[in-house]
Amino acid sequence: MACKPVMDGVLWNLGASSFPTEEQNYTDSAEKWRKDFDDMKHIGIKKFMLFTGVPQGMTRKAAAAPDIIEFIISECDRCKMDFIIATGGHPNWFLDWKMPDEMKLVRSYVDEIHRRYADHPSFAGWYIDYEFSLRYNDRQYLRDLYRETVILCKEKTPGLPVITSPFFNPPTSTDIMQCGIHEPQEYYEYWSDMLAYSKPDILALQDTGGQHLSFFEKDTTEPYIAAYAKACAENNCRFWGNVETGEFHVGSAEEFTEKYGKDGHVSEHPEIWRPVPIDRLQRKLEVMSKYSEANMSWGYQPFYRPSMNAAAATAYRDYEKYLAVNFPEMLVD
C-alpha cells in the first residue's frame, strides 16, 4: 500500500451540506470545539481543511468566537495540525461563466484570508473550491479557472501547496442524477490535461463519486481511482484520497430510480444519509490506500466529531476500535 488505510485529515463544512448541520459550528461553545479537536487529535488527524462556507465563516459571529475561522486555526496551532483553507468563489460558479468576475471575487477572498490567518504556524495551503468530474462543454473555462486560481495562491504564499478534490461517477444501470457514464480512460485523459495545464500540487480524489451511493464497491471504484492516480503520477501532482464517511443508503441503481426517479438528487433527501458502516469504511480505505500517500475524509464528520449526534458518537467509537486493533500507533492519548 502507498499509505496506511487510515484517515489523517478531515475536510470541514462551515456552510450547508447534505449530512451535518452547519448550525453546530456557530452554536457550539469554545469548550465543545476544543473537545472536538481533542477527539480528532486522538484518532490521528493531522490535517484540517475548511471548504464550503469560508466566506460565511469570516463574517458570521459564532458562540465560540467572533471569528470562527480564527478560532479554528488557533486550535490547529494547539493540536499541531496543518490548516488548509478554500479559496472561495461564487456559489453558482458552475452556472455563471464570467471569468473576470469570478477571479475578482476569489482574489478578494484570498487576500482577506491571507491578511487574517497566514501568520499562524499551522497555515499550510489552499483548496480550490470548484469540484467537478468531467465537463466537456466548459472545458477551456475550467482549465483557465483552475490555472488562474493556482497562480493566485502561489503568488500569495510561495511554497505552500494548492489542492483540488474532483470526483468520478461510476457506471450504473441507469444514469442516476444525469451524471453521465464515462470509462476510467476518459478520466485519465481529461485530468492528465487539466493537471498539466493548471498545475495544482495535490489532487485528493473523492472515492464514491458525485452520487455518493452506498452500493458502490471496489470492483466499481478502483479502476477510476487508478486512472486518477496515474494522471497525477505523470503530471508531478501528489495523489491523496478523499475517503467519504457518509453515504446515501440505497441498495441498487434500480431501487434509487424506483424511489426517487432517475433525475432525483441525493441532496434532496438528507434523512437517507448515514455514516458508512465500519466494515465498508475499512474496505474503502484499503482500496484508496493502494494508490494514495495520505487520506482525507470529506466533511460529513460522523467518524471524527462524536459530539454531533448519537450516530456520530457510535461511528467515532467504531473507528477508534478499528485503529486500536489494526493501527494502535495512530491513537494519541
Predicted regions and their residues:
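Ligand-binding pocket scaffold of soluble enzyme catalytic domains
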Residues: 3-25, 35-43, 221, 225, ...
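Aromatic-lined carbohydrate-recognition surfaces of secreted/lumenal glycan-active proteins
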Residues: 6-15, 83-104, 127-131, 146-185, ...
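Active-site mouth loops of central-metabolism enzymes
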Residues: 10-32, 95-103, 175-184, 256-280
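Aromatic-lined substrate-binding rim segments of carbohydrate-active enzymes
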Residues: 27-92, 138-163, 215-234, 314-315, ...
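Substrate-binding cleft of secreted/luminal carbohydrate-active enzymes
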Residues: 48-49, 200-214, 231-333
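An active-site-proximal structural segment forming one wall of the substrate-binding cleft
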Residues: 65-79, 97-125, 145, 152, ...
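Active-site groove signature of glycoside hydrolases
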Residues: 90, 109-140, 201-209, 295
